[in-house]
Amino acid sequence: MIRVRGVAKSFPGPLGRHQVLRDIHLDVPEGCLYGLIGPGASGKSVLLKMITGLMKPDRGSLLVGDDEVTTASDLKLQAMRLKFGMLFQNNALFDHLTVYDNIAFPLRRLYHPPEEEVRARVAERLTCVSLAGFEDRMPSGLSGGQKKRVGVARATVTRAPIVIYDEPAAGLDPVTSQKIFDLLRAEQRAANATVVMVSSDLDRLLTVTDRVGMMYRGELIFDGTTAEAQVSEEPRVKQFVHGLTEGPL
């Protein structure tokens, strides 16, 4: 369970403090695939960084399981991050490492298992993302979709119970994007993981998520099931879901 209560965050700007998050309240149940949608600069990625302890809020509470993120020491945060697999939008592959070593990197760095276990885990991940036989390829020889698949394999190789994806299909064509979304859903179901995913592709997000949160100008304007989002009468939610164009959000 991820529980966010009253979280707010601002940053300094040329005209004073700029409020990025405003009194955010949401719950992500254990084993849920939760999607976050919203226009650019609505605070989605900032919220992800706070959930993982990479950024502190100005106020509010963030619970991951029984652990309070906002007051945790650096040592405690380091231990808490073992619960997370992460794939951020700019989380590029290491160009100088093979596909195998890219996927193995978090496993080796965080857990130091025997190399035999590393080989088994990486092989299993490559099979799951349909890249068996790509172990010795370099990132420069991969397509955009293949790179995303390697990123998914790297984010899940440690078998962390919580996985964070920030725009996992950004920049891909529609067919490849759908394949990535279907892969993420299949991975989540197989592991019964708790997943929080940011995406600007609402149509595809709604096909795979259990719950969805919609953000606008730092506020969470909707938090509910995917089915509830599709029938909501809240004007801004309707505009998100149905692509209405009668004026700006």
Predicted regions located by residue number:
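The feature captures the beta-strand-to-loop junction immediately N-terminal to the Walker
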Residues: I37-P39
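Helix-to-loop junction immediately C-terminal to a conserved catalytic motif
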Residues: T52
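Conserved ABC ATPase "signature" region
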Residues: E68, E115-F134
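Conserved ABC ATPase signature
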Residues: M138-L142, Q146
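A short, proline-enriched helix->beta-strand linker immediately N-terminal to the Walker B motif
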Residues: V157-P161
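Catalytic Walker B motif of ABC-type/P-loop ATPase nucleotide-binding domains
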Residues: V163-D166
